[in-house]
Amino acid sequence: MSDVKTPTYTKKDFESDQAVRWCPGCGDYAILAQTQKTMPTFGRKKEDFVFVSGIGCSSRFPYYMNAYGFHTIHGRAPAVASGVKIANPDLSVWVITGDGDGLSIGGNHFMHALRRNMDLNILLFNNRIYGLTKGQYSPTSEVGKVTKATPFGLSLIHIS
């Protein structure tokens, strides 16, 4: 048993000094606030947390956490997070991804991270659209979804 005492943290300890750059009213603010509020309850040092993201609105997340983080390339956060976890098994590694990043371009990496059953935490922001481009439908968009990129709606029949 270690004699080193884990510091007591608050939500404020996990807030970075970076200005949050999401659109007004975006649900990502609530996810960030709740994550920052929850991190102290794990009873771990801040240095034990690593947040790994890909591309998209959700992927700015590591900048807003006062912890270690990587902003990787599109869809590859699960692969990078797997490497972090293999090299540092005692860390609490978090994949931060969106429905476009994690289920479309990174779908294969997401699936293999699940298949490997590694001790990763995956926080998937599902807004059912590519939010950063503000108009492309994502893998979780509703059938018939009208966007700037699909003004006549998403039709699986017409795609096939």
Predicted regions mapped to residue ranges:
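Glycine- and other small-residue-rich loops at beta-strand/loop junctions that grip anionic moieties
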Residues: 24, 99, 153
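Thiamine diphosphate
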Residues: 57-131
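Class I SAM-dependent methyltransferase SAM-binding "motif I" and its flanking Rossmann-like core
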Residues: 130, 134-137, 143-154
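Short secondary-structure transition/capping segments
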Residues: 93-101, 139-148
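Conserved small/polar residues in nucleotide/adenosyl-binding loops
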Residues: 157-160
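A short, structure-level motif marking secondary-structure boundaries and short turns
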Residues: 7, 20-21, 66, 93-95, ...
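Cofactor-/ligand-binding subdomain signature composed of acidic, glycine-rich
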Residues: 1-15
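Active-site diphosphate/adenylate-binding microenvironment
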Residues: 12-73
